[in-house]
């Protein structure tokens, strides 16, 4: 759907979830998408990836700031804080979640960049909402988690 779609329009489509992907520029420049996420959280599972991650973070009250040196290229090491495992993923972003702004938002940081410690993924402790700053491979566990959230949503509808 276009960036200026309303929550009512999205809900009328009767989809099982909302996937918000990448795009150019500063996430602070698209408040309409931030509002859309705020309006839909709790009504359907949401997965934000790359720019979508930044928008999910803003929608939950965290800050997203411009990085001094962005992450670009392949094979960036990322630590999964739940498992302790190191994953590798391509990245291309100049903005990041401000880790100091997460407290009190209901977000929990789940992955960090091994090289500089910046947050790379988060999930809501309140809503069925997930997000990742890095490009997810086709079999990444976050997709499976998102699918499970959508299945649970259908059972509880």
Predicted regions and their residues:
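Structural motif
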Residues: 19-21, 123, 133
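Catalytic His-Asp charge-relay segment
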Residues: 128-132
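Short hydrophobic/Thr-rich beta-strand motif most characteristic of the beta2 strand and flanking loop
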Residues: 1-3
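Short amphipathic alpha-helix with an adjacent loop that forms part of the alpha/beta core around
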Residues: 7-14, 103
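Catalytic beta-strand/loop cores that center a nucleophilic Ser/Cys/Thr
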Residues: 84-127
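Cysteine-nucleophile active-site neighborhood
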Residues: 12-88, 94, 99, 137-149, ...
């Amino acid at each position: 759907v276009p960036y200026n779609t309303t929550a009512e329009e999205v809900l009328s489509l009767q989809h099982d979830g909302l996937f918000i992907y990448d795009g150019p520029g500063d996430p602070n420049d698209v408040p309409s998408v931030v509002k859309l996420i705020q309006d839909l959280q709790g009504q359907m599972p949401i997965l934000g990836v790359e720019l979508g991650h930044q928008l999910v973070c803003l929608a939950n009250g965290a800050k997203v700031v411009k990085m001094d040196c962005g992450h670009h290229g392949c094979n960036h090491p990322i630590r999964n804080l739940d498992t302790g495992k190191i994953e590798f993923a391509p990245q291309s972003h100049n903005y990041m979640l401000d880790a100091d702004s997460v407290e009190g938002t209901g977000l929990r940081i789940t992955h960090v960049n091994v090289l500089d410690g910046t947050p790379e993924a988060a999930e809501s402790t309140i809503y069925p909402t997930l997000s990742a700053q890095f490009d997810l491979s086709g079999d990444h566990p976050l997709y499976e988690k998102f699918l499970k959230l959508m299945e649970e949503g259908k059972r509880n509808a």
